[in-house]
Amino acid sequence: MTELLSILYKLRIFTSDELSEALKGKVKSVEALLARYKQQGWIVAIRRNTYCMKDIASGLPVCDKYEIGSHLSHTACISYHTALEFHGLAHQPFNEVFVKSMTRFNSFSFDDVDYTYCRQTKEIVGMMTPKGNPYVRVTDVESTLLDCFDRIDRAGGIEELLHCMESIVLLNEERLIDYLARYDKAFLYQKTGYLLERIKEQANISESLLELCRAKGTKSVKWLTNNEESDTFVNKWRMYVPQELTSKEEYELI
């Protein structure tokens, strides 16, 4: 039993198929082993056919929400506000985990945390496995920011996003330019330029990056958030934004 538990604790989180592969020739029935270990309190079922080992001392799952989210499919990746949390940029933690995946899974709740499927049809831009944590896949800071600019709702709203951006001190502009080109969305260039200009001095954002965003992204008038909230026009970026985000010098009320 000690050898089997050692294998399971090394896996940490697994499906029955993954457990079968790891225990080849060691047990007659993986299903019986799972049932026994669940009853004995070694294992907890996260959802159907996904299991996590429990800490012996606390009785809690050994995996955190980042590890769980990363294991929901072979392409699962922690994204949006959850990635901001992982990188230490979030203003406040959420009880919702956003998971990009090219393989669909049903959103579910476990241990008072909601795991939300975010549809991804192309290769996930900026996905990384952090040093020292091989169980997690997460978007890097630059990709996370662009994702949050693209889907401000998944960043917790514009106020939360701006609070998160206050913690940014350095960005890799080469990555930003590469990722923007790969996303190839004019509106994302537009939002990126406007939002990064707000932290230009703080994060040492170059004028050339902002000019690129203007050239690629100001071909039409857009709204940063919904039409009711974004009521103030910023001429430089040809975009309506919430009035509280602007100074008197940079907007025209329409």
Each predicted region: which residue ranges?
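Hydrophobic/aromatic-lined pockets within catalytic cores
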Residues: K24, K38, G88, D150-D153, ...
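Short amphipathic alpha-helical segments with coiled-coil-like heptad repeat character
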Residues: V27-K28, H91, D153-G157
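Short beta-edge/loop segments at beta->alpha junctions of small alpha/beta modules
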Residues: M1-T75, L171-D184, L188
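An N-terminal domain-start capping segment
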Residues: M1-L33, S107, I124-M127, P134-D140, ...
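Short gly/ser-rich loop at a beta-strand->alpha-helix junction or flexible surface loop bordering the NTP-binding
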Residues: S16, A35-R36, Q40-S58, V62-I124, ...
